[in-house]
């Protein structure tokens, strides 16, 4: 929708009705000048795909997605890939029970300081490759994953 709007610095989305939206992939990808965005009124109840949603938003410094309902999301591939200025993300309400792909989700989020993944359920995740690659400043908090997910996640926490 706003993909490759490289001059976009901020946007008012308060009048957007996203109630029937199922696909948000690439929505803000490569908005390299985007510094802030308020998505608190987004209704994400029916969304199934959030892959590459913020890919390449290299000027974005923080984002609060605590209002997102992610129960039906299946794909979070490269969701924040290349958000190199991103220091904080509020994912406190993320329910990932149906997600199958988290590969590259935080790849190259080199300024990201901490993540609270307390609601992340990785039972159905098939791919976590490069999930935290190049996240040199990252401290992960409150991780609760399945035994299978723990083995997969441990492999990618230290890259």
Predicted regions and their residues:
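Negatively charged
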Residues: 1-159
């Amino acid at each position: 929708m706003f993909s490759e709007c490289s001059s976009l610095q901020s946007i008012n989305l308060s009048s957007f009705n996203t109630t029937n939206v199922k696909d948000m992939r690439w929505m803000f990808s490569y908005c390299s000048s985007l510094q802030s965005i308020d998505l608190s009124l987004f209704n994400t109840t029916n969304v199934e795909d959030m892959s590459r949603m913020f890919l390449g938003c290299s000027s974005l410094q923080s984002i609060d997605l605590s209002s997102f309902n992610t129960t039906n999301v299946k794909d979070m591939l490269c969701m924040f890939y290349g958000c190199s200025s991103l220091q904080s993300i509020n994912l406190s309400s993320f329910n990932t029970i149906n997600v199958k792909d988290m590969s590259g989700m935080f790849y190259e989020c080199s300024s990201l300081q901490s993540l609270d993944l307390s609601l992340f359920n990785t039972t159905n995740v098939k791919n976590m490759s490069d999930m935290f690659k190049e996240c040199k400043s990252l401290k992960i908090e409150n991780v609760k994953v399945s035994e299978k997910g723990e083995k997969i996640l441990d492999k990618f926490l230290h890259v």
